[in-house]
């Protein structure tokens, strides 16, 4: 059975901390280096629900994509929700390790996992990492479809293949337009529009798209935009990371039991569609 320090060394080889953005907070948050690890849980968010899931599972290590403390704090009191997470982890001898922007740009990384979930063929990074001479690392991925789809069909595929959320998939653009090439980026993606336009793709699937960036992007060209829930676009990475750690465990004879969280931590819990006619309450006259 490996020690935590050995497992962390393996995770750091997959997602080196030095490749994280300067503002990010990655690495081991809680954990005793010499503690033994037999069971690991991967999740998107280090929130109480996933920590409780780790406790119930008997996990020794929780690996999350999002940081617990992205900004500094002066307290880990259990009266705060993040402090309660820390207390629960320590009381149950569960370590917490975070791989965030260093997993976004990895090869394979968050957007590779998203592309794989949608059966897209990855061509190259959307925003290449200049430090990678092979040009395989970077933010987002430019992809090709094996067979053309309409925007509507691509959105339906995303709704079917990604974890279900209240939001589903929002679309901007002609639903019947043909899509042969797609850019994808797990997590917030509306800062990447210049790169998407430069890539010359037919569609862009990401999360957290806002009104003004979408309006301006649509004014530039007829690019189709597909907006999924942030959590849903990053959850496939949990399966990828778990598979990678499984392979490492087998290679070293660690016999780790690696699990992927099924807890939905997307903060949106319901969706009510607008009335279809202009006579709906609140519609313009």
From Swiss-Prot:
Domain of life the protein comes from: Bacteria
A GO cellular-component term linked to this record: cytoplasm
Record: residues binding a divalent metal cation 1: 65, 104, 234
UniProt-recorded Gene Ontology molecular function terms: metal ion binding
Alphabetized InterPro entries for the sequence: DUF34/NIF3, DUF34/NIF3_sf
Swiss-Prot/TrEMBL keywords: Metal-binding
Pfam families: DUF34_NIF3
UniProt: a divalent metal cation 2 binding residues: 66, 230, 234
Description of how the protein assembles with itself and partners: Homohexamer.
Family as reported in the entry's similarity comment: Belongs to the GTP cyclohydrolase I type 2/NIF3 family.
PANTHER family found in the cross-reference section: GTP CYCLOHYDROLASE 1 TYPE 2 HOMOLOG, NGG1 INTERACTING FACTOR 3
Protein name: GTP cyclohydrolase 1 type 2 homolog
Native source organism of the sequence: Streptomyces coelicolor (strain ATCC BAA-471 / A3(2) / M145)
């Amino acid at each position: 059975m490996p020690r935590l320090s050995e497992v962390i060394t393996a995770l750091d080889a997959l997602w080196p901390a030095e490749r994280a953005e300067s503002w990010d907070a990655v690495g081991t948050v809680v954990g005793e280096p010499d503690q033994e690890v037999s069971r690991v849980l991967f999740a998107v968010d280090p929130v109480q629900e996933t920590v409780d899931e780790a406790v119930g599972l008997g996990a020794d290590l929780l690996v999350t994509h999002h940081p617990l403390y992205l900004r500094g704090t002066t307290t880990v009191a259990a009266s705060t929700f993040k402090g309660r997470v820390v207390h629960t982890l320590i009381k149950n001898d569960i370590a917490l390790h975070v791989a965030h922007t260093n997993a976004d740009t990895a090869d394979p990384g968050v957007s590779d996992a998203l592309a794989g979930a949608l059966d897209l063929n990855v061509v190259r990074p959307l925003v290449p990492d200049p430090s990678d001479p092979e040009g395989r690392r970077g933010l987002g991925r430019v992809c090709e479809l094996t067979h053309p789809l309409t925007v509507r069909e691509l959105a339906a595929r995303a709704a079917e293949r990604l974890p279900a959320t209240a939001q589903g998939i929002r679309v901007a653009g002609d639903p019947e337009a043909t899509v042969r090439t797609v850019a994808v980026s797990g997590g917030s993606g509306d800062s990447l529009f210049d790169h998407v336009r430069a890539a010359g793709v037919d569609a862009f699937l990401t999360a957290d798209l806002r009104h003004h960036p979408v309006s301006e992007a649509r004014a530039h060209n007829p690019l189709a935009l597909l907006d999924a829930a942030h959590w849903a676009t990053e959850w496939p990475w949990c399966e990828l990371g778990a598979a990678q750690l499984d392979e490492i465990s087998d290679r070293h004879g660690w016999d780790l039991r690696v699990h992927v969280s099924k807890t939905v931590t997307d903060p949106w819990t319901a969706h009510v569609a607008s009335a279809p006619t202009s006579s709906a309450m609140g519609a313009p006259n």
